[in-house]
């Protein structure tokens, strides 16, 4: 039996992922490392985004364009849900986009992930922490909501964190090139230490302060890739059964 070139090409096609609210690409690069073909979308210019990029409003994208992808990741603005907004009581100054983003993603029918900070109104989220990844030296809790199963790794104890921020109870200088560091505007670790701690080598300090480590989405991306592969296998089995039924 000769297998058609078209069939082989379809079977070997790389899965495409749409990275919404992509900023400088912490999430997108993690998916890329798994093997996804990633396209980023952000309403603001992102000159340091290291993958194909489209400047556009994620809330008004053409549904047909979104449907051309296999999965979608979204990191809507987190400021309204942040600890800082709660302390300053100014959360209403920022847009709350999780609900409208969820509605848009659900309508696509595609597997999706929504990422945000602790306290964000995500549904049954998985929590990822830097302590779960040996290559990282940040705490960096982030929530991930998905419409496919994600297994969370064990969550270990938090080590002491290097920071210059006097508001933190772990204030004090140690060795920022070896210890855990606070990668935020108030943490004030150097850009070199921040890049090493986060596994990111292409962002500015301001960009990295708002980023998630690629290790997080690399971890989720592996499970997403397995989910997509299982879906394709089921679709193939269904097609084979239907073919046999029609041919009988």
Per-range role (PLM):
Residues 1, 16-19, 192:
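Exposed boundary/loop context
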């Amino acid at each position: 039996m000769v297998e058609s070139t078209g069939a082989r090409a379809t079977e070997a096609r790389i899965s495409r992922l749409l990275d919404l609210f992509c900023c400088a690409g912490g999430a997108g690069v993690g998916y890329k490392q798994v093997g996804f073909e990633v396209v980023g979308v952000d309403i603001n210019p992102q000159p340091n985004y290291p993958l194909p990029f489209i400047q556009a409003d994620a809330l008004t994208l053409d549904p047909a364009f979104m449907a051309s992808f296999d999965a979608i990741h979204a990191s809507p603005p987190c400021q309204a849900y942040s600890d800082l907004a709660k302390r300053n009581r100014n959360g209403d100054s920022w847009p709350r986009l999780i609900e409208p983003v969820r509605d848009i993603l659900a309508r696509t029918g595609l597997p999706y992930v929504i990422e945000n900070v602790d306290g964000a109104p995500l549904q049954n989220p998985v929590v990822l922490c830097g302590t779960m990844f040996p290559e990282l030296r940040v705490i960096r809790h982030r929530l991930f909501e998905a419409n496919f199963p994600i297994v969370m790794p064990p969550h270990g104890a938090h080590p002491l964190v290097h920071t210059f921020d006097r508001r933190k109870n772990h204030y004090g200088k140690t060795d920022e090139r070896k210890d855990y560091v606070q990668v935020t505007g108030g943490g004030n670790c150097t850009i070199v230490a921040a890049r090493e701690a986060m596994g990111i080598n292409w962002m500015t300090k301001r960009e990295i302060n708002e980023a998630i480590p690629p290790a997080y989405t690399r971890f989720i991306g592996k499970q997403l890739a397995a989910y997509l592969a299982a879906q394709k296998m089921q679709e193939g089995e269904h097609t084979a059964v239907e073919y046999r039924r029609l041919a009988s």
